Amino acid sequence: TDKTIPEANVYFIGFCVHRGSCSMEVSDFLSDLSGKQIALFGTCGMGDSPEYYKDIAGRVSAWIEADNDYLGYFICQGKMPQKVRMKYESMRTDENNDQIDRFIQNFDLALTHPDDLDVEHAKVFVDHMLKKIQL
């Protein structure tokens, strides 16, 4: 990022999932941190899958250097740009019709996310992280 980020002991790093990970800006920022406590949170358009979210968190947390204290992660479903739905529709063939239907159904369900329940879960995550933080 071009912006100066204030020095802190604890960082809550947010990101939107893109192709199963975070942006290069986020990964660069994470890899530059040293001696910090770090919690990750993000949104993911590709459905509500705890297993997939765990995989994403593993890929993103891999950028955190070993001298940091990785506190944990929270990922919830997030909405996607309309161009994603249009791409799905343009990819449809007789062979992948059912798969594209599932992608579009997920896209439509994601339009309301993050929702109130996601926000409540995020609050629980933050409370849990605050208990882990060593100031």
Task: Report the location of each language-model feature.
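A short, well-structured beta->alpha microelement
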Residues: 1-4
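FMN-binding flavodoxin-like domain, especially the glycine-rich phosphate-binding loop
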Residues: 7-135
